[in-house]
Amino acid sequence: MTLIPSSTPPLPDAIGRKMPLLKFLLPLVGGIVLAWTCKDMINRWEWLIAALIFTLTAITAIVGKRKWNGWTSAIAMTLALICIAGAWSMQRYNEIVTHWPQNEQVWLGQVEQIKKIKESHTTVIAEIKSDKKQYNQKRIQVSLQGNETLKLQSGTNIAFKARINEKNRPGNPGDFDYATYLLQHGLSGSAYCHTAQWQILTIPTTSNWHTRFLHLRQKLVNQYAQYFHDTDLSLLAALTLGDKSLLTTETQQLFSDTGTSHVLALSGLHIGILISLFNLLLLKRLRYGWKHGAATLFLLAALWGFVLLAGAPLSLLRAALMFSFMQVAQSLQRIHSLSLNNLALAALLLLIIDPFTLFDVGFQLSFTAVFFIISSNDYLWQRHRLPFWKDDIYHFNTPRREFYTPKAYFRYFTLPSWKYRIKKHSYKIFRSVLIPFICISLSAQWGTAPLILHYFHTLAPYAWLANFMVIPAAYILLSAALLFLLLPFSFTQVALAKVIEWTLHLLTQGLQAISEWPFATERVYATSFTLVCIWFVPILLFFFFEKRKTLTRKALLISSVALLIISIGAETFSTLTIRRITPRICVYKATHTSLIHFIQSNAISYLLSSTTADSTRLRMTPIEQNFFMPNHIASPTLITQSQASYPTLQRANGLFLFHHKRIVYLNLPFELNAIGPIDLLIVAKGSPTNATQWLANTSVRQVVLDGSLTSRQRKVWTKACRATHIPCHDVLQQGAFIWTLP
């Protein structure tokens, strides 16, 4: 055996040369971000006027003959592109933003897509049908209750009575900004309807191609439902058809904890599997000519049909565009069919169609992963490959059998030859399949790690290892599901259903086992600077080892060390100052429940709840994830006794003393004349009904209405506070009340 080392080729061209469309993509991205940041200050016409001024400046510089006119024209044209992108973004923003009536009204709508199916309600995307121009064809998200939701499908007309909210009500600290999420996804508002507040209409429906494909997807899911149930059905529908409405929170959490959520979102992985099957079965058997061209056109038509069938998610649109460019390039016998420039072109097209696509997490993860996969392959993996295998001359000379006994021939020639061939093919598989698989997985994980930590605060160290299980399973499931749908015979579907069921069970059990490993899932809350360092420090170190000039190597090494030192300093400063919790009182937003939190420090705090310990733990789960964990707040001590004394908190029935402040928890009608001035009055269910008289006889600085009050009690106390000129905070309307103590 001889291994022939391959010489290391020089560094490829810079990113700017490999990606010439980057000069258009970056101004477009910058304009969208600036427009969103300044959406309340700069309107569309101001962006257009600025774009016109910069365009005229660029033209003037091009016509002129001075030395610096080239730079002037380039800068002016870049600024003009930024302003044009800003104007287009504001145009899109104005189309989405809608000021809905403040009262409940009856609306007509058509279901576009079923977003999520839960036991309590079903969430759909609906298009409003109205005679008023400002409301017609606006897309909103509606949550519907009742058994009738089982009859909903794409294209169904519904009538519902609700108040549509364009802005979400403030919630608890660290809560998800739901209104911004809806706006960035082209949705003008949200509504919630109880069972008696909506109904399905039997009027004829007019559906577009998108709705028809979604209706077809629902039929295919129903076909799955004849053989699969519960978790198997939800996973199969998500992995093969992009329908994630049936996925449970537990299943999504399992894939998130193991770092394999990408397999649930249809993307380049799934399209790559389908195209590889098509190439293997058909395209590779056809020479370049009209037959190959016809097969390519059929492949592209099937590809885009699959995109529409899956609901056209952004990750799938990106993959479909890139694979379309790749197939066309291969038909034209172009060598570099999969390039960074194709990635930039796909991003440009999607951002021109809808600029707010930029803020979609799936869009960011998809493009970042592909960018790092291609870049790492060009700069690192293709330049430092394992050596080739070269056969020894001995193995080309096989002696004649008649000179040896069968036993001797088998021992000295046949058996060594088998061992040699096994070793040779194993090495080729290791070099051509296993190593590229690991490299792609590590590149994607490195590129998407900062975004995942920023949005989800989750680190899955074994994600690259879990891909060895997930990706082969996805290949089997897609292939079997394709045959399952194309061969509608009972005996074939039963056999394929068994294969799919076994694969799904092995997949879920394997991921469950990985999720139980030590350090399988870590919650990380890092500063933005540290997240950026995850990208740039490895890049600087890579060029440090590649460059040969001493000064360049010193500059790269110093830059890497400086970034690491600044990152450590930023994390230390954030932990000691920004995330250090000072004494405060928090009255959280929770319906039908009182949740009052007395915080002394990050390590010491006390919680008063009006419900049981199990119910309190359930209601506090999102607050712990969004507020406690990012700020390193320990679990609070639950106050269970009416008479209690702690180092910084004393309780006597409804009276609390915390940091020399008097706090009254009013859930019983009793007199407080002997207590004196009240710094904070928390009104709960069971409080006295004569609110005005009660407030007039006491000295109260601040009133807080917690979530346990009924709407009638809330109105009574709000009116009483206005009459007595006492500040009043309603947690259900204004969000959690936070009082930072001196």
Annotate each language-model stretch with its function.
Residues 1-102, 318, 336:
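N-terminal leader/targeting segments
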Residues 2-15, 67-71, 80-262, 633-646, ...:
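Membrane-interface helix/helix-cap signal primarily in integral membrane proteins
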Residues 23, 31, 63, 68, ...:
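Hydrophobic alpha-helical transmembrane segments in multi-pass membrane proteins
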Residues 31, 109, 162, 239, ...:
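Divalent metal-coordination and catalytic microenvironments
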Residues 37-46, 361, 465, 522-526:
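Membrane-helix interface and helix-disruption motif detector
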Residues 45-55, 366, 467-472, 528-532:
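Alpha-helical transmembrane segments of polytopic membrane proteins
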Residues 149-150, 161, 392-422, 486-742:
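Non-globular, low-confidence helical/coil segments that flank catalytic cores
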Residues 209-227, 235, 243, 251, ...:
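Hydrophobic alpha-helical segments of integral membrane proteins
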